[in-house]
């Protein structure tokens, strides 16, 4: 829809109370899925995954035993195996280091990990995944490049235990396509366009866990994240899925390691600067020749931060030339596309169709104010709603986040602020306190707008409308989608409120409604004399259907 098109009609908050009461009654009459998540029922007619016979290995405690029709055999001792893809048929000689057992993939089944999965929040379970193969003669619609269950992947039983323990029964849509490509042999690069909430973290996690040898105490896979918060969360996902394996993880972020200590874990997860520092120190810290997989998550966010893109390529240059490179990004403008093609050349590619990205699972409202001061007064009045579960309040500037937090605390409210200017240890403690429920309300900037998933969050407040920055025209709708995607996770109900206070912010909200094709309920802060009724409207919004 164009910007010139009239926005969807909004309703007053008073009307909203009556309407939501009706919706609540209607909801009680229906037991349907209503778009909140995929059912756990597995589909029939499994498609065979890419097959390359795994090479058996003696004395490898099961990690190298043959598994029929395995899509990956750890791929590193049998790099010349044929699997329909083009690529090097030799190991380029960098296996002068000890060669790990040849096969690590037996079975596995489950879906996403709880911390970064669920097809129920931002992304509905009806989106389509488009596959583009690096081998132009290959058929992307072939059953070889799709699975319907994790059992078809013949993953290691210890990985299967971890997935099942996490409570998942079937792959998400993107996992159905990504996992056969990631696990095939010889290993091929992969570029994926995927938002948080689609299962991509579990996908590249399973690939890393399948590629490393737990009997060799040195890093064999590296995952790069643009922030320490996301790196810590990815480590939690890897540890959860790999809990029954002997694979260890190491968090490579500032302050997490002694500069002269050798790393004896198989998977490194961290931020670019720290990873460069480790690799530059050479064999005293780790052996770069042993790295088999390099993963980059949230590439678009990383590119947006000055210097991180260059550091990422420095990491790539310090690794063997035939490392499997995997890149995921939520958006793919020209800069991201160019970066991705350089980072992962000759890659298989997976994309979500843009029109399939929806926000239907989240109840959206906007609160119309007259001034910045009235915005704060409205936020303070809403505090009782913010602590029904947990809430995140997004601001444009760090100073605004601190100012709001200080004022709310001075009024006796329990909140915390989080942004990039805080010390690393302080940021960790603040986010941990929010994760475990010690803090109910977090005032923050975009530092946790992407990828960070906390199940108890059921309200997001956009105190400031996200914009495109200097020289930009209009709202940053991608950031808005990522922000509100912090709520409504894992089948829970979610509510989003965005504040307006002047012509520009009101116009931006209209453009957001037009683009998303979804009306927002209007709350007029100027006429709010009965706070209880306003709270009732928001509470109903969080309980009722989106």
From Swiss-Prot:
Kindly give the Gene3D superfamilies that the UniProt entry links to this protein. Answer: P-loop containing nucleotide triphosphate hydrolases
Q: Which GO terms describe its biological process?
A: poly(A)+ mRNA export from nucleus; protein transport; translational termination; tRNA export from nucleus
Q: Name one Pfam family in it.
A: Helicase_C
The alphabetical list of record keywords is: ATP-binding, Cytoplasm, Helicase, Hydrolase, Membrane, mRNA transport, Nuclear pore complex, Nucleotide-binding, Nucleus, Protein transport, RNA-binding, Translocation, Transport
**What is its quaternary makeup?**
Associates with the nuclear pore complex.
Q: Motif Q motif at which residues?
A: 148-176
Annotated region Disordered: where? 1-113
Its EC number is 3.6.4.13
User: EC class of this enzyme?
Assistant: hydrolase
Task: Quote a single Gene Ontology cellular component term.
Answer: cytoplasmic stress granule
Family to which the UniProt record says this protein belongs: Belongs to the DEAD box helicase family. DDX19/DBP5 subfamily.
Domain annotation text?
Answer: The Q motif is unique to and characteristic of the DEAD box family of RNA helicases and controls ATP binding and hydrolysis.
Bias-annotated ranges (Low complexity): 72-81
Membrane-related topology note: Peripheral membrane protein
Per its record, the protein catalyses: ATP + H2O = ADP + phosphate + H(+)
Primary location class = cytoplasm
Q: What species is given as this protein's source?
A: Cryptococcus neoformans var. neoformans serotype D (strain B-3501A) (Filobasidiella neoformans)
Q: How is this protein named in the record?
A: ATP-dependent RNA helicase DBP5
